[in-house]
UniProtKB/Swiss-Prot annotation:
GO MF, one annotated term: microfilament motor activity
Tissue specificity note: Expressed in fibroblasts, brain, lung, kidney, spleen, and skeletal, cardiac and smooth muscles.
Organism of provenance: Gallus gallus
Region of interest: Disordered: 1118-1168, 1694-1717, 1879-1917, 1936-1959
Biological process, per Gene Ontology: actin cytoskeleton organization; actin filament-based movement; angiogenesis; blood vessel endothelial cell migration; cortical granule exocytosis; cytokinetic process; membrane protein ectodomain proteolysis; monocyte differentiation
Protein's job: Cellular myosin that appears to play a role in cytokinesis, cell shape, and specialized functions such as secretion and capping.
Keyword ATP-binding on entry: yes
Protein name: Myosin-9
């Protein structure tokens, strides 16, 4: 029952899926997916398509809705409902994936494969799918054999670890509450069950139990209830389970990350603290409560929400389970009580209350009961505890001072103490669990790591803990993306596979850099660490710095919704997260009252003091408070003795974790949360869709489908699957790649299913599983055949033994019977008595012979002894040689071991030296960087000095100007003020430069951090080298094993040592050479060791020099500080000068006549300036001298270090040469050993061949005997059951007729299926051609789209340029012509143009987005069609394989029928032979009977004669002589008769034996015939069923093909419609592009006009400046120039308007008719008339100049104000000048046209004509462009023609294919004819069976005659027993009986000979 419930939650009900009604409904309604707000996507049927939109009818309510085509997604057929692997879906889109997950979730199927990983949805209820029975179900199964499950993922990881010897990791990722922790527990449960060394279910090992019990303990102390999850892990853990070589668990290790210790003191609403607090308060007994001073829930301040319960969980029971788990873990009771005391102490810490005293801010403790409880529980003194909190000792300078704490500080200290205590306890617990799990002494070969880390958290406001958790999840998701998308595709490219790199756009590095980047700009964690070093830094300053540094980052935003609450927002992969930076600095530093820490370390409780043993690592409050105010941000670096922040520690932990994960093979489990209400059976589609998008599920499925996820190395592929292709690879050596190519050809795999790389074979998903199934089937067949051979061999052996026993028993019985007959016979007794006497006379002769034999034997013995002595001496010599060889081998092994040890030492020393070299190199690089920084700073200082000198010179020139111009005008005074402003700007620049210097110092610190990262990378390299060393050690072990095997082989080859003497001598010579080489190598090693010592000395020297350099660097830093001080002095002097300048100004304003005092002041200032210059020059010289000295020292140190490095490299090269020589020698020795082993293997191979031949002969002999016995049995059975056979024959005839009918029907069905197949193939070919067409069209569309995109980019660039120009024009127009109405009008026009441009740009963007959507949709559909094509190809190949199999079956049937016919012929021949034998025996019997009758008659005559003789007794004497003669004659006759009788009896016995054999043979033949008939019937039935099955499968496949064909036709139609739509879109886009180009040209013309205006304004501004510099007398000329400028502006405006109109008119007319020159001339005349009108307008404008003159007068009044603004405008003018230069570069042609226009204004008609001609040239260029476009169109037409030709060629190919199919049909007809012939042969066999019946009848007659003969023989035997025969006859019979044994043996031999002859 339980199993049935589990199956419900594992397997899919196939009956519901394979419902034909749903299939028909889907096909008829054209069902698709439509977006829905409620359920994500909704099913609907496609009714009508109207342009870009489609009308659909919703399936739920029948409403008709208009939807955009791009929003519609295809629906999969119903047979793909609830599919186990979403990679199998034909239509892969968001809607299908969501629907599949939803259907499975509602059916209770929570696990679903998604390509290479597994998706799990939290069911929020218990499911019966985790029992031991389920574990056993999944144990050792392949992935495709079982439904999706976490056990299947774990089993694949475990099997791949065992098979590939590669470390594995299982990463459970997802949001909080998605089920990661539960799946982690199931993984551990499965591994503990499968990999346990205790295989019995009841007896589980202690280690496995402890591993299972580690989770409940960690959950109790580290998990808590949150809003999203009732059992949320508030820490991360990485569980590493170690396995030995055999796959058994040998230990485990747990690493934890980022415990949320703040939860111990406060919790959010409706949340709990850690479970253990509630477990303890609920589950502790009364005695324990009193010992631990426990109180109710509401008495504890740290339990913010009181007693919050978890539904379905009892805290009391959980407490007992936790205590039991700790007992199983081996934690003693004392430590358990210590843990509980610490937990109670943490709760009591929250009850300590502080109050503020009245007069001061000092805190006090009015009630110390809670403190007393805490001190009692933790074993510390109360007074010391209260003193340490209220007045702690803080280090100030070198002294310690007691400082009173405020209430806030005391509260903070208590909370920090509670958090730190809980954290220390948790660390101790993890350490204790690791100690318990790592106690085994067995070495772990590999491990499986299980990662369970806190999921992604998005609360309303998030803190520092959430940032760390989300940062971790970002890194894990990046690892997933990297392994799934980047590494996968990189491996394809590295292996040389044809692959287009797909960018899925899932790079999360920007977000990771935002958090972790150390510099350039620094990330959030780096900024947080930097702020921790500033004493006055706050969370607010940290946020400001973050916004300043990262404000422009794309993943950083300011909060929009929660502006008042949140500080900043980060865009993570899972969404936007708002962060509140409250107490982040404190959380990052994590300070603690070190007075209390030392007090706890000195606790009387051993457990508490053990917890606080690492007091030195704790950051004290004095360290935080005592940070120097001068500490720069760049000084932040973690050295020894300095504290490390939480962020740094976590970054390092995370880096280690990511490194271990990268070194493993990851298996991803993506956990998904269905809803936030924690309700079972409810699924929020939008929530699930967001998680699927974030997790990259669709991309993972797509790369799994498109890529080749399964890959096998060549050697492994050949080794594993060569059984499937036995004759594909020829014998001998072959390259692995070539072998794999041959194997794949033999396997007949489709080329689309695999790719062959450089070292591996890559397969698509599911191909390897299919190969594994075929391999399993092959192995089962081979094993079954092997078992059958073994059983047959054993049966034959037993039968032969039984036969031998039977013959022996018969011989014994006969001999016993003969002895019983002879033992009472007197002659026999006499014979036994006389026989020994006869031997006495022979004994002397025998003794003589024996003596001679003895002499010969003694001689032989002496010779043998001599030989033995010689052999012993030879053996002794051999043994001595053997001992010598053993000693030499031992010596060699010892030498090798010593050499290996020396090599290992050398490698270790080499690694140490390399590390030292790396450190030195790193330090040298640091020194070089410092020197570079110092040089750069020097250059900057020199530049500053130069700038100061320049400033001083400028000030001097300003003073001179002041003295010269102070009398003339007050305007120059204002100018001097402006110069002062400029100086202030320069001061600001200097300040900015100072900031830049500080920033560079921060960059220096970041470089230092980068150097630290480099050191980490070096550590990674070290790890790699260690791994290399381990590999070398493994090689050494292998070599030792090989040596052991060599010794074994040497022992085996001792018998053949005489043949190997020469080789041994050669080996000895080689050994001697090796010894010489080893001695040389030892000398070289000693020399190398001496060099190493010298290098160590040099290293010490280098270290000393480095210290000296460091001291010099410190001196340089001091010099730098002094230079900074001097610079500050210079700045102060500069300020003083500025103040004096201001004073001078005031004096100038007061007194204009005091020039002498001013000159004196000036001379003083000049003297001061010269003094300053001299001091600066002196300082610069000294600085340069110091830098030169530093350079010299630094260069010397670098040279020395380079020499040391070169020496180490030489030593390294020598060592590597020695190592290579040793390895080459080892390789030579191994080659020689291999040659010896090959010789031995060849000998063994020959011996095995001979044994195999013998076995084959024995098998043939036994088979012959078996065939003989079987034939005998057949004859017997044929005799007994011929009638049954006749009935069976009749039945078989009827069945054969039925089979013939069925066969004909099947053949017709086959023809139909073949015709359908031909149609399908034609359709496929047509589809393939259409697909090619669509692909070509797609490529063309892609090209067009790319052109469109390029045009769009150009437009965007032009628009952006125009917008920038417009903005600049706006600024310039606003600044220069703010008072002019023309500028306002131009501004309005610009705004209108910009608005229209933006509108058009938005329209273009919308059109582009639409095109992109259609492109992506078409791409997806193309991918789906490609997948469908692959399926179609696979089905076709499967059908072809089935057809081949069917042909093979037919051929096998023919072979079987031929075999049966042969056997039948043999049986008939044997039956005929037996019949002839039986007839001959019957004749012999008749003759014997006749002889017997004659003998009886003769006996009667003898009796009568005897009676006559008795009657004539009286006449005895008369006729004695006659009687004796008669007697002799009678005796002779009796003897003859006796011999005849004996012969007859022998013949009778033989006939009886033959009869018995015939009966047995008949029975065997009959049984065999029955069996054959039954077998044939069964085979015919099976074949018929198989044929019916195949026909049904073919029908189903035909149905599928028809459906797929209809789908493909629909898809083709849709593609054609989409192509039409695309073409229309492209046409519209082309039109829009043309319009945009026209509009851009218009804008360019407008910009030219604006540039003219800008040029005019610039020139006017320059002229105004010139006029302002000159006297007021030149105002009149300026007015005239202004009038001219205004006239030119008006003329330019008019010319602009005129040019615009002319351009528009010209464009219109050229569009109408481009080739008409006459019209152009008319247009020219019209334009000339227009120019005349423009001249008239000029005259009108001249009238308006008077008004402008009035305005200019007003402007003259404003000139004074403008003079003040001119200086501010200068900087803008410089910027504008730069912009103008850029614009001049870009617009040279525009300037030329401007000049033409200006000349056109001056020289009226001629210039206009030239301008018009230039425009005509432009128009001609446009015409050229259009002709080019037409040429491109003609090219496209040619391409289309080429496509048409290709299509025609494809049509020809299709015709050829059709002809081929016709040939195949003809072949099938030929096969039908052959089958008909076989039927006729079967009828002939039936006729033969009738003949056989006749023979059977004759056999029956023979058996009846044999029975009669048997009766007669039995009567003869009875007569003999009665004694009716005379005495003489009986005596002869007795004499004859002594030889019966030998005769019967002879008969047996004769029979055996006959049997061999028949065989």
């Amino acid at each position: 029952m339980a199993q049935r419930d589990a199956d419900k939650y594992l397997y899919v009900d196939k009956n519901i899926i394979n419902n034909p009604l749903t299939q028909a409904d889907w096909a008829a309604k054209k069902l698709v997916w439509v977006p829905s707000e409620k359920s994500g996507f909704e099913a609907a049927s496609l009714k009508e398509e109207v342009g870009d939109e489609a009308i659909v009818e919703l399936a739920e309510n029948g409403k008709k809705v208009k939807v955009n085509k791009d929003d519609i997604q295809k629906m999969n057929p119903p047979k793909f409902s609830k599919v186990e692997d979403m990679a199998e879906l034909t239509c892969l889109n968001e809607a299908s994936v969501l629907h599949n997950l939803k259907e499975r979730y509602y059916s209770g199927l929570i696990y679903t494969y998604s390509g290479l990983f597994c998706v799990v949805i939290n069911p929020y209820k218990n499911l019966p799918i985790y029992s031991e029975e389920i574990v056993e179900m999944y144990k050792g199964k392949k992935r495709h054999e079982m439904p999706p499950h976490i056990y299947a993922i774990t089993d694949t990881a475990y099997r791949s670890m065992m098979q590939d010897r590669e470390d594995q990791s299982i990463l459970c990722t997802g949001e909080s509450g998605a089920g990661k922790t539960e799946n982690t527990k199931k993984v551990i449960q499965y591994l503990a069950h499968v990999a346990s060394s205790h295989k019995s279910k009841k007896d589980q090992g202690e280690l496995e139990r402890q591993l299972l019990q580690a989770n409940p303990i960690l959950e109790a102390f580290g998990n808590a209830k949150t809003v999203k999850n009732d059992n949320s892990s508030r820490f991360g853990k990485f569980i590493r389970i170690n396995f030995d070589v055999n796959g058994y668990i040998v230990g485990a290790n747990i690493e934890t990350y980022l415990l949320e210790k703040s939860r111990a003191i406060r919790q959010a609403k409706e949340e709990r603290t850690f479970h253990i607090f509630y477990y303890l308060l609920s589950g502790a007994g009364e005695h324990l409560k009193t010992d631990l001073l426990l109180e109710p829930y509401n008495k504890y301040r740290f339990l913010s929400n009181g007693h919050v319960t978890i539904p379905g969980q009892q805290d009391k029971d959980m407490f007992q389970e936790t205590m039991e788990a700790m007992r199983i873990m081996g934690i003693p009771d004392e430590e358990q009580i210590g843990l509980l005391k610490v937990i109670s102490g943490v709760l009591q810490l929250g009850n300590i209350v502080f109050k503020k005293e009245r007069n001061t801010d000092q805190a006090s403790m009015p009630d110390n009961t809670a403190a007393q409880k805490v001190s009692h529980l933790l074993g510390i003194n109360v007074t010391d505890f209260t003193r340490g909190i209220l007045t702690p000792r803080i280090k100030v300078g070198r002294d310690y001072v007691q400082k009173a704490q405020t209430k806030e500080q005391a509260d903070f200290a208590i909370e920090a103490l509670a958090k730190a205590t809980y954290e220390q306890m948790f660390r101790w617990l993890v350490m204790r669990i690791n100690k318990a799990l790592d106690k085994t002494k067995r070495q772990g070969a590999s491990f499986i790591g299980i990662l369970d880390i806190a999921g992604f958290e998005i609360f309303e406001l998030n803190s520092f803990e959430q940032l760390c958790i989300n940062y971790t999840n970002e890194k894990l998701q990046q690892l997933f993306n990297h392994t799934m998308f980047i590494l996968e595709q990189e491996e394809y490219q590295n292996e040389g596979i044809e692959w287009n790199f797909i960018d899925f756009g899932l790079d999360l590095q920007p977000c990771i850099d935002l958090i972790e980047k150390p510099a350039g700009p620094p990330g959030i964690l780096a900024l947080l660490d930097e702020e921790c070093w500033f004493p006055k830094a706050t969370d607010k300053s940290f946020v400001e710095k973050v916004v300043q540094e990262q404000g422009t980052h794309p993943k950083f935003q300011k909060p929009k919704q929660l502006k008042d609450k949140a500080d900043f927002c980060i865009i993570h992969y899972a969404g936007k997260v708002d962060y509140k930076a409250d107490e982040w600095l404190m959380k990052n530093m994590d300070p603690l009252n070190d007075n209390i820490a030392t007090l706890l370390h000195q606790s009387s409780d051993k457990f508490v003091s053990e917890l606080w043993k690492d007091v030195d690592r704790i950051v004290g409050l004095d360290q935080v408070a005592g940070m120097s105010e001068t500490a720069l941000p760049g000084a932040f670096k973690t050295r020894k003795g300095m504290f490390r922040t939480v962020g740094q520690l976590y970054k390092e932990q995370l880096a280690k974790l990511m490194a271990t994960l990268r070194n493993t093979n990851p298996n991803f489990v993506r956990c998904i949360i269905p809803n936030h209400e924690k309700k079972a059976g409810k699924l929020d589609p939008h929530l699930v869709l967001d998680q699927l998008r974030c997790n990259g599920v669709l991309e993972g499925i797509r790369i799994c489908r498109q890529g080749f996820p399964n890959r096998v190395v060549f050697q492994e592929f050949r080794q594993r699957y060569e059984i499937l292709t036995p004759n594909a690879i020829p014998k001998g050596f072959m390259d692995g790649k070539q072998a794999c190519v041959l194997m794949i050809k033999a396997l007949e795999l489709d080329s689309n299913l695999y790719r062959i790389g450089q070292s591996k074979v890559f397969f698509r998903a599911g191909v390897l599983a299919h190969l594994e199934e075929e391999r399993d089937l092959k192995i089962t067949d081979v094993i079954i055949g092997f078992q059958a051979c073994c059983r047959g061999y054993l049966a034959r052996k037993a039968f032969a033994k039984r036969q031998q026993q039977l013959t022996a028993m018969k011989v014994l019985q006969r001999n016993c019977a003969a002895y019983l007959k002879l033992r009472n016979w007197q002659w026999w007794r006499l014979f036994t008595k006389v026989k020994p006497l006869l031997q006495v006379s022979r004994q002397e002769e025998e003794m003589m012979a024996k003596e001679e034999e003895l002499i010969k034997v003694k001689e032989k013995q002496l010779a043998a002894e001599n030989r033995l002595s010689e052999m012993e001496t030879f053996q002794a010599q051999l043994m001595a040689e053997k001992m010598q060889l053993q000693e030499q081998l031992q010596a060699e092994a010892e030498l090798c071991a010593e050499a290996e040890e020396i090599r290992a030492r050398l490698t270790a020393k080499k690694q140490e030296l390399e590390e030292i070299c790396h450190d030195l190199e790193a330090r040298v690089e640091e020194e070089e960087e410092r020197c570079q920084h110092l040089q750069a700073e020097k250059k900057k200082m020199q530049q500053n000095i130069q700038e100061l000198e320049e400033q001083l010179e400028e000030e001097e020139s300003a003073r001179q100007k002041l003295q010269l111009e102070k009398v003339t005008t007050e305007a120059k005074l204002k100018k001097l003020e402006e110069d002062v402003i400029v100086l202030e700007d320069q001061n600001l620049k200097l300040a900015k430069e100072k900031k830049l210097l500080e920033d560079r110092m921060s960059e220096f610190t970041t470089n230092l951090t980068e150097e630290e990262e480099k050191s980490k990378s070096l550590a990674k390299l070290k790890n790699k080298h260690e791994a290399m060393i381990t590999d070398l050690e493994e090689r050494l072990r292998r070599e030792e094993k090989q040596r052991q095997e060599l010794e074994k082989t040497r022992r085996k080859l001792e018998g053949d040592s005489s043949d190997l003497h020469d080789q041994i001598a050669e080996l000895q010579a080689q050994i001697a050479e090796l010894k010489i080489q080893l001695s040389k190598k030892e000398e070289e090693l000693q020399a190398a060791l001496a060099r190493v010592e010298e290098e160590a000395a040099q290293k010490n020297m280098a270290l000393k020099k480095i210290r000296e350099l460091e001291s010099q660097i410190t001196e340089l830093q001091e010099d730098l500080e002094s230079e900074r001080a001097s610079r500050n002095k210079a700045e102060k002097q500069k300020r003083d000068l500025g103040e004096e300048l201001e004073a001078l100004k005031t004096e100038l304003e007061d007194t204009l006549d005091s020039t002498a005092a001013q000159q004196e002041l000036r001379s003083k200032r000049e003297q001061e300036v010269t003094v300053l210059k001299k001091t600066l020059e002196d300082e610069a010289k000294t600085h340069e001298a110091q830098i030169q000295e530093m350079r010299q020292k630094h260069s010397q140190a670098i040279e020395e270090l380079a020499e040391q490095l070169e020496q180490t490299k030489r030593v390294k090269a020598n060592l590597e040469k020695a190592k290579q020589a040793l390895e080459s020698e080892r390789a030579e020795l191994s080659n020689e050993v291999k040659v010896l082993l090959q010789g031995k293997g060849d000998a063994e191979h020959k011996r095995k061949k001979v044994d195999a031949q013998l076995q084959e002969l024995q098998v043939k002999f036994t088979e012959g005997e078996r065939v003989k016995t079987e034939l005998a049995e057949r004859v017997n059975k044929l005799q007994v059951e011929l009638d049954n056979v006749t009935g069976l024959l009749n039945q078989s005839d009827s069945k054969s007729i039925k089979l013939a009918k069925d066969f004909s029907a099947l053949e017709s069905q086959l023809q139909d299926t073949q015709e359908l197949l031909q149609e399908e193939t034609r359709l496929k070919l047509s589809f393939s051609t259409k697909l090619k067409q669509t692909e070509d069209e797609k490529n063309a569309l892609k090209e067009q789209l790319e052109e469109e995109e390029e045009a769009k980019r150009n437009l965007e660039k032009q628009i952006s340029v125009l917008q920038q120009q417009a903005v600049e024009a706006r600024k310039k127009m606003d600044d220069g012509l703010g008072c002019l109405e023309i500028a306002e009008e131009a501004k309005k026009k610009l705004q209108k143009d910009l608005e229209s441009l933006t509108q058009r740009y938005e329209e273009k963007i919308a059109a582009y987005d639409k095109l992109e959507k259609t492109k992506t949709r078409l791409q997806q559909e193309l991918d789906d069609i490609a997948v469908d094509l692959d399926h179609q190809r696979q089905t076709v190949s499967n059908l072809e394989k089935k057809q081949k199999k069917f042909d093979q079956l037919l051929a096998e049937e023919k072979n079987i029928s031929a075999k049966y016919a042969e056997e039948r012929d043999r049986a008939e021949a044997e039956a005929r032979e037996k019949e002839t034998k039986a007839l001959s025996l019957a004749r012999a019997l008749e003759e014997a009977i006749e002889q017997k009758a004659e003998l009886e008659r003769v006996n009667k005559q003898f009796r009568t004669e005897m009676e006559d003789l008795m009657s004539s007794k009286d006449d005895v004497g008369k006729s004695v002589h006659e009687l004796e003669k008669a007697k002799r004659a009678l005796e002779q006759q009796v003897e003859e008769m006796k011999t005849q009788l004996e012969e007859l009896e022998d013949e009778l016995q033989a006939t009886e034996d033959a009869k018995l054999r015939l009966e047995v043979n008949q029975q065997a033949m009959k049984a065999q015939f029955d069996r054959d008939l039954l077998g044939r019937d069964e085979q015919n039935e099976e074949k018929r069923k198989q044929l019916i099955r195949q026909v049904r499968e073919m029908e189903v496949e035909l149905e599928d093909e028809r459906k797929q064909r209809s789908i493909a036709v629909a898809a083709r139609k849709k593609l054609e419609l989409d192509l039409k739509d695309l073409e229309s879109h492209i046409d519209t886009a082309n039109k829009n592009r043309d319009e945009a180009i026209k509009h851009v040209r218009k804008l360019q013309a407008q910009m030219k006009d604006y540039m003219r205006e800008l040029e005019d304004t610039r020139t006017s501004r320059e002229e105004i400046l010139a006029q302002a510099k000159e006297n007021e007398k030149k105002l009149k000329s300026m007015e005239a120039e202004m009038i001219q400028l205004q006239e030119e502006l008006a003329a330019a405006e008019r010319a602009k308007r005129q040019a615009q109109q002319e351009r528009d008119e010209l464009a219109d007319e050229i569009a109408n008719s481009s080739g008409k020159g006459a019209l152009a001339m008319e247009e020219k005349r019209r334009l000339e008339a227009r120019i005349a009108q423009l001249e008239e307008e000029l005259e009108e404008e001249q009238g308006n100049t008077e008004i402008i003159n009035d305005r200019l007068k007003k402007a003259n009044l404003q000139i004074d104000q403008m003079n003040a603004d001119l200086n501010a405008e200068r900087s803008n003018a410089q910027k504008n000048e730069n912009a103008r230069q850029q614009m001049e570069r870009q617009n040279k042609e525009l300037k030329l046209k401007l000049q033409e226009m200006e000349s056109a204004v001056k020289s009226k008609y001629k210039a206009t004509i030239t301008a018009l001609e230039a425009k005509i040239v432009q128009l001609e260029e446009q015409l050229d462009m259009e002709t080019k476009e037409r040429q491109a169109a003609s090219k496209q037409v040619r391409r289309a023609e080429k496509k048409l030709k290709d299509i025609l060629l494809q049509v020809d190919d299709e015709r050829r294919n059709a002809e081929q199919f016709k040939d195949q049909a003809d072949k099938a007809n030929m096969r039908l004819k052959q089958l008909k012939r076989q039927l006729e042969e079967a009828e002939e066999e039936a006729q033969r069976a009738n003949v056989r019946r006749k023979l059977q009848r004759e056999l029956d007659d023979a058996t009846e005659t044999a029975d009669a003969m048997n009766r007669e023989v039995s009567s003869l035997k009875s007569k003999l027993r009665r004694g009716d025969l005379p005495f003489v006859v009986t005596r002869r019979l007795v004499r004859k009986g002594t030889g019966e044994c030998s005769d019967e043996e002879v008969d047996g031999k004769a029979e055996a000979g006959d049997a061999k002859a028949t065989e």
